[in-house]
Amino acid sequence: IFTLKDLSVEAFVKKIDGYKSGKFLFYIDSPDPLKEFEKAFTLIQAGGGVVRNPQGRILFLKRRGKWDLPKGKLEIGEDISECAQREVEEETGVKGLFVLGKRVVTYHIYKQDQRWYLKETHWYNMYSDGREDLRPQKEEDIEVCAWKKPKKLKKLLKNSFSSLREVFKGEF
C-alpha cells in the first residue's frame, strides 16, 4: 500500500515502471482522488463492446497474440457509446449492432515513447445477428476475429489482459 504522504503519484508510477502487470493499492487523501491520480498521466478515453450473437457466443479478436475485445479511442465530437459501436464495426466487420447498455468502465496504465497514459475504457453490452463474415482489421494488428462460447471464457482470459478480466468479473 502506498499513500500520498509516502509517495507522489509521479514517484509511484516511476516505482512500478518495469512491472509487466499487477495490482497496486495506492491511497490518495484527496476529495477527488481519481482526478489527483490522473494528473500524472495523459488520459485516453476509449469505447468497446461485449458482443453476443443469437447462440450466446461472444465476439473476440486476437491482437498481437492475445485474446481481446474490440475497442478503440474516442474521436473528437463523438459520444462514447458511438465510439464503442464504431470500433466494433471497424475492427471486426460486424454491422447492424444493437447497443444494449453500459457494462463497466475499466482503467489501465501503460508507457509508450517515454510517456505514461491512463486508458479509461467504457464497455457496452451489444447484440449482433452474427450473419456477417468477420473481417479482422489488419492495420490494427488484429490476426483473427471469432465467436467464442461462454464456457471457453475462463481459458481465453488466461491469454488476455488483466483489464479485460474485469469486464467479465462474476461471469464464471
Task: Please provide the spans of the model-predicted regions.
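Conserved Nudix-box catalytic region and its N-terminal flanking loop in Nudix hydrolases
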Residues: F2, R52-E89
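Intrinsic-disorder-associated interaction segments
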Residues: F2-K5, L157
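Acidic, metal-coordinating catalytic segment for phosphate/diphosphate chemistry
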Residues: K5-G48
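Short connector loops at helix/strand junctions that flank enzyme active sites
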Residues: T42-G47, R64, K119-T121
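Conserved beta-strand and immediately adjacent loop positions that scaffold enzyme active sites
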Residues: G48, R57, V144
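Active-site beta-strand termini and strand-to-loop segments that position acidic
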Residues: V51-P54, M126-S128
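Unchanged
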Residues: L74-S162
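Charged phosphate-binding loop/patch that engages nucleotide di/tri-phosphates or the phosphate backbone
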Residues: S163-F172
